[in-house]
């Protein structure tokens, strides 16, 4: 009878090396698809399914859902009124996975995810309005933007950069298709504004970020009004913006009634928020720009105010605000006098100028280097130590 071999215990040195190995993250590689629900740390859709499996959680969520549908969304200046039974339902959800769940702007079923987020938002705060809590989780990608500037030789050498970025979009099948879709929806004497906005939202959500940013944030010479006009007309303002400027507070109230618009506005205020009078910004410029572009196609669509500068503003007014005049001007100024947004736009335009300058010989590498300025996509400092630990471990295990 053959006795089974008992596995020999690992020596202490091997166990120590195993403990030294850090957990390996799984960043999105160059060819990976857009983030899906499964890639999110705590998707609200997944959290909702977990809640449905628990009778107590499911009942509390349904009750809270009926509360949020019957209670109007409070504005920042208003004190929310929450019935006691709704507060009790919110309290029952505070230990569930729904608290802290997130969404992603490019995920499937995004609106359904945001509906869940804003339903449990009351449970997060127990009735206190939290304007600065973005429902979006940032997903880092390492995909570089590859482009061939030699294809622009068909343009005149002195063509403005907005025309060059428009050509780059035309040469890209996906960007060209999405741009034509909103161009058709937003043109004509009798355009349907809601259709135009929906196609604009689709473009800035699905087009590659460098293409979208290049089209909208292309730099122009100070005296080049034609370039400035092309840039300002990128979002087809004659159709996308309201013909008569509404009151800014009414525009915000309309935005808050839509989960998607509300989410984009909160995301913008989260990532473009000046922290102090010195203009210290809450997050890095790339996130501010991403949040800014996320507003295009919503009720809060901003745009450049003229053809001669890069100032942006909402298409609204503070006339008729009464006692809320100061609050209205603060909302308006968050776009027109926001140092974080202004500097983020200026920095991106400087980068776009460098892409086409003669002393920038490797455009593909330049884009990758610029993306790596974001600390979230830099190589992790433990990568060399991971290799140095793994090689001795393999050798020891082979000898053992």
From Swiss-Prot:
Gene Ontology CC annotation, any one: cytosol
Ribonucleoprotein found in the keyword field: no
Main location: membrane
Entry PTM: N-glycosylated.
Tissue specificity remark: Widely expressed in adult and fetus which exhibit a similar pattern. Essentially not expressed in the central nervous system, but highly expressed in several sensory and sympathetic ganglia of the peripheral nervous system. Moderate expression in many non-neuronal tissues, particularly those of the digestive and urogenital systems, but high expression in stomach and appendix. Several types of glandular tissues show low expression. Very low or no expression detected in the hematopoietic system.
Sites where a glycan is attached: 95, 148, 309
Subcellular location: Cell membrane
Signal sequence, start to end: 1-31
MF (Gene Ontology): axon guidance receptor activity; glial cell-derived neurotrophic factor receptor activity; signaling receptor activity; signaling receptor binding
Disulphide linkage map: 51-57, 162-218, 169-175, 186-196, 191-239, 220-227, 248-316, 255-261, 272-288, 281-340, 318-328
InterPro entries: GDNF/GAS1, GDNF_alpha, GDNF_rcpt, GDNF_rcpt_A3
Lipidation (GPI-anchor amidated asparagine): 374
Topological relation to the membrane, as annotated: Lipid-anchor; GPI-anchor
Keyword Transmembrane helix included in the entry's annotation: no
GO biological process: glial cell-derived neurotrophic factor receptor signaling pathway; nervous system development; neuron migration; peripheral nervous system development; signal transduction; sympathetic nervous system development
SMART domains (UniProt xref): GDNF (SM00907)
Propeptide boundaries: 375-400
Protein keywords: Cell membrane, Disulfide bond, Glycoprotein, GPI-anchor, Lipoprotein, Membrane, Receptor, Signal
The family this protein is said to belong to: Belongs to the GDNFR family.
Functional description taken from the UniProt entry: Receptor for artemin (ARTN), a growth factor that supports the survival of sensory and sympathetic peripheral neurons. ARTN-binding leads to autophosphorylation and activation of the RET receptor.
Quaternary structure and interacting proteins, as annotated: Interacts with ARTN ligand and RET: forms a 2:2:2 ternary complex composed of ARTN ligand, GFRA3 and RET receptor. Interacts with SORL1.
Name listed for the protein in its UniProt record: GDNF family receptor alpha-3
Organism listed in the record: Homo sapiens (Human)
Name of the gene encoding the protein in the UniProt record: GFRA3
């Amino acid at each position: 009878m053959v006795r089974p071999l008992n596995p020999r215990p690992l020596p202490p040195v091997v166990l120590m090396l195993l403990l030294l190995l850090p957990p390996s993250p799984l960043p999105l590689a160059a060819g990976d698809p857009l983030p899906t629900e499964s890639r999110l740390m705590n998707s609200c859709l997944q959290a909702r399914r977990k809640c449905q499996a628990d009778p107590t959680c499911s009942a509390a969520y349904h009750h809270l859902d009926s509360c949020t549908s019957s209670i109007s969304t409070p504005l920042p200046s208003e004190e929310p009124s929450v019935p006691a039974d709704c507060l009790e339902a919110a309290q029952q959800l505070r230990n569930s996975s729904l608290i802290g769940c997130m969404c992603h702007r490019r995920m499937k079923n995004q609106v359904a995810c945001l509906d869940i987020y804003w339903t449990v938002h009351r449970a997060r705060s127990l009735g206190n309005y939290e304007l600065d809590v973005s429902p979006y989780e940032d997903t880092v990608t390492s995909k570089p933007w590859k482009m061939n500037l030699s294809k622009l030789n068909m343009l005149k050498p002195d063509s403005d950069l907005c025309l060059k970025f428009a050509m780059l979009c035309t040469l890209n099948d996906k960007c060209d298709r999405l741009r034509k879709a909103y161009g058709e929806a937003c043109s004509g004497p009798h355009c349907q504004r809601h259709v135009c906005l929906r196609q604009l939202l689709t473009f800035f959500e699905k087009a590659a970020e460098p293409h979208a940013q290049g089209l909208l944030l292309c730099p122009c010479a100070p005296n080049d009004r034609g370039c400035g006009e092309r840039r300002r007309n990128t979002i087809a303002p004659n159709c996308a913006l309201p013909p008569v400027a509404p009151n800014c507070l009414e525009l915000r109230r309309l935005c808050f009634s839509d989960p998607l618009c509300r989410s984009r506005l909160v995301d913008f205020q989260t990532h473009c928020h000046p922290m102090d009078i010195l203009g210290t910004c809450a997050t890095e410029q790339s996130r501010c720009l991403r949040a800014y572009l996320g507003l295009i196609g919503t009720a809060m669509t901003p745009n450049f105010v003229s053809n001669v500068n890069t100032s942006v503003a909402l298409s609204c007014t503070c006339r008729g605000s009464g006692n809320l005049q100061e609050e209205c001007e603060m909302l308006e100024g968050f776009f027109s006098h926001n140092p974080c947004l202004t500097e983020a736009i200026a920095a991106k335009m400087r980068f776009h100028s460098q892409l086409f300058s003669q002393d920038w010989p490797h455009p593909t590498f330049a884009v990758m280097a610029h993306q790596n300025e974001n600390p979230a996509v830099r190589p992790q400092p433990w990568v060399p130590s991971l290799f140095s630990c793994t090689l001795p471990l393999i050798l020891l295990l082979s000898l053992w």
